[in-house]
Amino acid sequence: MTQAGTTEPDDLALAAEFPAPERAAWQRLVAGVLRKSGALPEEFDGPPESLLTTRTYDGIEIQPLYTADDEAAPAGFPGLPPFVRGARPEGTGWDVRVLHANADPAAANRAVLADLENGATSLWLRVGGDSLAPAALGEALHGVHLDLAPVVLEPGEEYEAAANALLAEFAGIPDSEVVGTLGADPVTLRARTGEAHDLTPAAELTAQLAAKHPKLRTLVADGLPYHEAGGSDAQELGAVIAAGVAYLRVLTDAGLSVDDAAARLEFRFAATADQFLTIAKLRAARRLWARVTEVSGGTAHGMKQHAVTSTAMLTQRDPWVNMLRTTVACFAAGVGGADAVTVLPFDAAIGQPDAFSRRIARNTQSILLEESKLAGVIDPAGGSWYVENLTDALANAAWREFTEIERRGGIEAALASGFVRDRLAETWEKRAKRLATRKDPITGVSEFPFLAEQPVEREPLPAVVPGGGLPKHRYAEPFERLRDRSDAHLAEHGERPKVFLATLGPLASHTARAMFASNLFQAGGIEPVNPGAVDDPVAAFRESGAAVACLCGSDKSYAAQANDVAAGLREAGAIAVLLAGKPSESYRGITGFAYTGCDALAVLTSTLETLGVK
């Protein structure tokens, strides 16, 4: 009974008085909006919503709306094949894994203990090369209870020495209770360096340890090199599955069963700010691996997944925005069912992360796990028409990538022949074009830059020596190189390169394009000089001290004034005059155009060169 004494109905049919929604009605509304905005040509005869469809780098179509008509086949249950909804039946969140790569064992130990005392639950240690020496592993792990905080190694070429050093630290822990990952990954070594590395020693080490340490994993199939080379999600998945198959083959040759071999593997993936693709990638990966282990003669296996926030998406400029990127990526990795997640500190692209950035990275995971209750429901995205369709489409695309690699003799042969490099280069070319045109925007760098930001200073990372392996890209680098040139100019001349915004007409008619031009030029480190509404833009240009001008106004004001103002600007000393708008042959004296979808990198590079900025 309610307080008024009435009885509540068992079924509140709140929508009973409304007509049943129909797709056709929604399509008519979409058509009206698109037609009003000029995006729908009168002669267009397809479904209007098709103009809102986008494509991933794998060619997967993303529809603007998914309905019950798009319902996919049931994905099963967590802990059961095909493991789309999770490899673990209990779904108890994920392992908060922190990365340490400091070569100083004392400094590494201080950071390790600080992480473990403040929310981290496992450690990922880079060993060898410019990172921690295998012999220093004991000092770095001093005071760490290895039965409570598992260690995952990334040992590079020194995996045998690193493995022996870590195994020595397990003294006092029952052999059957030793957990962790030794991290041997000869396939990734080849991808990183271009040099062949024999898989057999790692397989033999695995066979030796299998019976003694049943919970210890020894090999990692890592997708990060393919992601960082600019690859698509399906290309990353296909290469990782192919690496996993290569390890299955060599492990079974060493005497392990398919099931025992599969239990020795861990898989690493990039988590990006594209949350739905990250969720779908992790779900699709488990489905693919279950299929591989099943057809290989074993039982369908779940996949031990380690998700790492993407280094490719990190920026050096306005690095605080990286906190937002890594939060979204961590959210997606958790929802996608990763067993362990590493959130890279926001300053990881600048230098050695400091205590503050490490704390923020840890707390990002703590908030999502504890405050947001993200782990309270297993696979919360499961059943979403969009997510399920995207998972299926990505799994199919990745399987095609995997079979192409297998057709060429497997991952080692495909790397050696250049097939993998060429496939990744094709995708990077497409991605680079979208980055340059800002169709893939980078907030704080290519869009909404903050020219007056104070640089974040960090201890430098070891210099990377280019090798013969896969390239490593960071999406913001081309724009950041322009900003570096601007900074050098500022240091030498006391001011930044400038562009005068020659505003035409009243404020209302020029503001939109003036704001667009201002945002664009700042992305290249060029300071915009905006005089506001002026009666004589040529006179204002003379007083500005700028050498390049950009007309900003409405199409109507361009038709009436652009040619005369451009001529006046050239007479006043402008060495180049650009126009904020689409190119047109009707304009005279215009040396370049800046508009939505233009090659912003080309416009900015050309402008800096015109201004003599080295």
Put a short name on every predicted segment.
Residues 1-274, 296, 304, 340, ...:
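Catalytic alpha/beta active-site cores
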Residues 2-13, 247, 266-447, 576-583, ...:
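Active-site capping/gating regions of soluble enzymes
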Residues 2-28, 37-39, 48-54, 58-84, ...:
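Intrinsic disorder at enzyme termini
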Residues 26, 30, 137, 166, ...:
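Generic structural signal of hydrophobic/aromatic residues within well-ordered alpha-helices
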Residues 44, 104, 278, 282, ...:
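Charged, low-complexity surface patches
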Residues 114, 208, 332, 447-448, ...:
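Hydrophobic/aromatic ligand-binding patch that stacks against planar heteroaromatic rings
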Residues 348-349, 384-389, 501-507, 538, ...:
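A short beta-alpha structural unit
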